[in-house]
C-alpha cells in the first residue's frame, strides 16, 4: 500500500517534470546568492560553506512542505485516506518517503558540486554529503508533522515554518558540526551517530504523530 | 453498551446530536439501515445533511449519541468499519494532473481494492467516459470529473455506501446510470445512505426518508 | 445525563477551587518577592569579580529555570489532555504558555543585559543561548498554532502534539553547557553536588525562584479561569454565574 | 477600487492575526539560523550581517508570493477580477501593495533589532533599514509578475523562485552594497538612487506586466 | 464586420467553433439573445456548455466565429462589455476566511458596484441567509456558500447574466428564489444565459433552448 502512495506522489511529481528540478534550482540559487550578499573572499566562504549549504537544504525542504498534504486536502483525497482501511501511519510514511525522494535526494546529489564552488576540501565534501544523506530524511519526517498540524489554516505556509524550524535546528547543528569537525581534523563519528539517532527516532515517532495530527486537523 | 456482533449486518444510530457553533443541527436522531435498504437524507440547505454523513462515516465525532455497525460502536471498529464502507463527499478526491484511469486506480487502491488498468478502463467505459480515460482530469468537464469519482462504486466491494450529493453536475443519462448502480448494490444486500436535492424515484427497493429541518 | 454531569462539572469545580486558591498564592508570591529582592539588593555581598552587575542573576536564573520547567509542565498537561480527552488539562496547558513565553523572554533579555558587561556583547550564538531562543520559538509556535485554529477542541489537540514534540529541546538546553564548550556559565546548583556559591547568593536565588514560581501559579490560575469561562459560556453554570446565582 | 483590494487583503491577513507575525518570525528564524550553521565568531558575523538579513528578507518575501494569487485562483475570485470593469493593473497594484504591507513592512521594522544581534554599528543599522525600505516594495512588485506567471502550475511555489530570484539579485546586490559602502566609510547615496530607480521602474511596469501575465495564465 | 451600435441591446454569436484537444465541441453555432430573453444551454456532460459560456463572457477565445454585443465585437469592447455583464462560474469566488457579508461586499465591489453593510445584509437575508451573515464561509454548508455567490445577482445592475449551473447544491426553496430573481431581471429587459441539468419551468418569459451534443 505504501508503494501506491509513493508511486502516486512520484507520478504526480513527474507529470510536472519541472517540480523536481525546481526544488533543486531553489537550492542552487540560494547557495549561490550568499557569495553575492557577503562578498567573494575565499577564506570566509570556506567557513560559511557547510552552514550555507545546510541552511539552503533546510529551506528547500521546508518550502515544499506546504505541498505535502495541502493539495490532497483541497481535493478530498485526504478524507479518503482517513477512511481508508490501510493504516494512516503507513500512508503518511509513504508520503514522507516520496517527499524525501523528490526534494531530499536531489539536494544530496547536488551538494558536492556546490561545495566545490565554495572551495571545500574533498573530505569535507564527502562528510557534507553524508550528513545531508542522514539529515534530509529527518527534515521530511519532522516536516510532515508540521504540515499536518497546519493543514487548512490560512498562512499555514509560514506557520509551518515556525513550528518546524525550531525542530530542524538540532539537525542543522549536528549536520554542520560534522563538517566542521572533519575540517578541524577531529572525528565526526559522534555527530553522525547523533544524526542517525535523530533519524531512527523520527522514523519511529513521526508517522504516528503525523497521523494523529491529520486526524486532529480533519476532525 | 456493545452487544456483540448481531447476525445481520446493519447500521444503527442512536440519539445522535450535532452542534455547530451556536446551532444545534439535530438532536435525538435515531435510525437504522438494514441490508437492501436505501436512506435518503433530505432537508433544506444547511440543515445538517453533510454533517450527519460525516458523523456516520467516522470523519467527525457526534456531540452526543452513538453509531453502531452490527452492534459495535464504529469508533471501536476502526479499520474493520472502514473496510466495509465507502464515502463519497462533495469533493471527489480527483487529482488534476492525473489521468482518469490513474485517478480511479489510485482512489481504489486507497480504498483497499487494487484494480489493474483494464478493469479501470472498463469501469470508466461503463460510466460513460470511454475515449476520455487518458485525459488529465484538469481538462474534464465538471460532470466528467464527478463520473471519475463515482466510477469507484462500480469496482468497490463494500456493503455500506455513504454518498453526499452524488448526482451534482450529472446529466440525465448519468443519473439513470447511477440509479442502476445503486439498485444493483441494494439488490446484493448492500446499504446506501445518500443526500440529494434532485428527485430520484426508486420503486423496487425499501426506501427510508430522513428529513432534517 | 450522568456522563454529562462529569464532563461539565470538573472545569466548573476547578473554576471555584482556583478562585479560592489565588489569594493564598498571591500573598506567598508577594512575601517571597519582598524577601528575595531584599536579599538580592541589600543583603547579598557585592561580587568581587563582577561587581554589582551580577545581581541580575536573581532574576535571570529563576526566569531561566521557570521557562524550562513551565514548558515541561505545559507539555505534560497538554499530553494528558490529548491522551485522556480531559478538557481541563488542555485549558491549563494553554494557560501556561504565555507565562512560559514571558519568562523565556525575560531570561533572554536579562541574559543579554548581563552579557554586555560580562562578555562585551549583547548576544553570542552559543548553544545555551540559542537553545533558549528555540524554546521561545516553541512557545510562540504553540501559541500561534492555537490562535490559528478556531475550534478549541482541535486547537487543544494540535497544540498538544507540537508541545510534546518540542520537549526534545529541553534536555538540549539543559545539557548544552556540557555538550558544547560555551561562553555561558555551567550549572552551579545541582542536587548531587554541594553548592559552590555564597550562601546569601544561593538563598536569595532560591527564594526568588519560589517567588517566581508562586507568581506563575497565580497567573496560570487566573488565565485558566478566563479560558474556562470563555469555553463554557454556553453551559448552565456560567449563565447562572452571570446572573449571580452562584455568587 | 484599489482600496477595496488592499482593504480585503489586509482583512484576510488580520482574520488570522498570526499571518503577519509568521512572516516576521520566519525572517527572524532564518537570520538566527546562520550563526548556528556558521559559528559564533563576531568578526565573521559582522561581515555577513547585511547579506544574511537581505537574503532572509528576500526569502521571506518570496515565500509568501505563492499566496498572492493562488487562493484567488483556486476559489474563482481571479476569474471575477479578470471580468471586472475595473482595470486589472489597478487591482494588481492593490494586491502588490497589500503584499508589501503584510510582509515587507514588518521586515523593515524588525531589521534593526536583528542587526544589533550581529553587532552592527548604528550607522550601518540605519542604512540597512533604509535599504530594505526602498528594496522590499520592489521585491513585492517583481514577485507579483512571477506569481502571476506560475499561477495554476503544480510546483509553482518553487517555480516562482526560479523566475523571480534572478530579478531579485540586483536589488540584493545594491541593498547590501549600500550597507557595505557605509561600513567602509564611503557614500551610499549612489546605491540608494539605484534602488530608488528600481522602485520607480517596477511601479510603472510591474502592474502592467502582472496583469498581462494573469490574462495569459487564465487564457 | 462591426456594424455600429444597434438601437436595441443584444448578444449575438456567429459561427462559433470550439475545439478542445482532439474534440470539436461545437462549430457553426449562431444565436442571438434579446432583452427579456432567457437561453438555456443544455446537453450531456462534456458537451461544451461551460466552454461556450466562457467564450461568451470573454474568458477564452473561440477557435472560430465572433461574439457581438450591440453589434460590436466583445474583444473590442473590453471594459464596456464587462460593465454590463455578470458571470458566475462553477467556482463561487467565495473566501473561506471571510464572512458572508464581507464576501458579498467584496465580490460586488470587484464587479464595480459598491454596497454598504446594510445593503449586503439585506441581500443575504433575501436569499435565505439571515442569521448567517457573520459566519466565515468556511463553516457554511455547500448550498449556503452557493447562495452567498448568488446574492450578487440581487444587487448587481448589469443586463446580461451568464450563469454556469447556478442551481447546483441548492434546495427546492432556493431554486424557486433564484427563479424569481431571474424572472425579475428578464422583466426589466435583462438577458440570461444559463446551463442546468435540472428542469426549470419558466412560462412567462421567452425561453430559448440551445442543446449541444
Ligand atoms: C541571552 C543570554 C542568556 C541566556 C539565553 C541564558 C540562559 C540561561 C539558562 C537557560 C539558564 C538556566 C540553565 C541551568 O539552570 O542550568 C541560565 C542560568 C545561568 N546563567 Fe544565563 N543566559 C544568558 C546570559 C547569561 C550571562 C551573560 C551570564 C553571566 C555571565 C549568565 C549567567 C548564568 C548563571 C550564573 C546561571 C545559573 C547557572 C546555574 O547555577 O545553574 N547568563 N542562563
Ligand atoms: N462554527 C459554526 N458556527 C455556526 N454555524 C455553523 C458552524 N459550522 C457549521 N455551521 C452551520 O452548520 C450547518 C452545516 O450544515 P451542513 O453542511 O451539514 O448542511 P447540509 O445539510 O449538507 O446543507 P447543503 O444542502 O447546503 O449541503 C450550516 O447551516 C452551517 O451554517
Ligand atoms: N485538452 C483536451 N483534450 C481533449 N478533450 C478536452 C480537452 N480539454 C477539454 N476537453 C473536453 O472538452 C469538454 C469540455 O466540456 P465542458 O466543460 O464545456 O462541458 P460541459 O458541457 O460544461 O459539461 P458538464 O455538464 O459536465 O459541466 C469535455 O468533454 C472535455 O473532456
Ligand atoms: Mg451538504
Ligand atoms: Mg460545465
Swiss-Prot record, chains B, E:
It is found in: Cell inner membrane. It comes from the Bacteria. SMART domains: AAA (SM00382). InterPro entries: AAA+_ATPase, ABC_transporter-like_ATP-bd, ABC_transporter-like_CS, ABC_transptr_haem_export_CcmA, P-loop_NTPase. ATP binds at residues 43-50. The keyword Cell inner membrane applies. The keyword DNA-binding does not apply. Keywords: ATP-binding, Cell inner membrane, Cell membrane, Cytochrome c-type biogenesis, Membrane, Nucleotide-binding, Translocase, Transport. Its EC number is 7.6.2.5. GO terms for molecular function: ABC-type heme transporter activity; ATP binding; ATP hydrolysis activity. Residues 11-213 form the ABC transporter domain. One of its GO terms (cellular component) is plasma membrane. It is a peripheral membrane protein. It holds the Pfam family ABC_tran. It catalyses: heme b(in) + ATP + H2O = heme b(out) + ADP + phosphate + H(+). One of its GO terms (biological process) is cytochrome complex assembly. Belongs to the ABC transporter superfamily. CcmA exporter (TC 3.A.1.107) family. PANTHER family: ABC TRANSPORTER I FAMILY MEMBER 1 (PTHR43499:SF1). Part of the ABC transporter complex CcmAB involved in the biogenesis of c-type cytochromes; once thought to export heme, this seems not to be the case, but its exact role is uncertain. Responsible for energy coupling to the transport system. The complex is composed of two ATP-binding proteins (CcmA) and two transmembrane proteins (CcmB). This is Cytochrome c biogenesis ATP-binding export protein CcmA. The gene is ccmA.
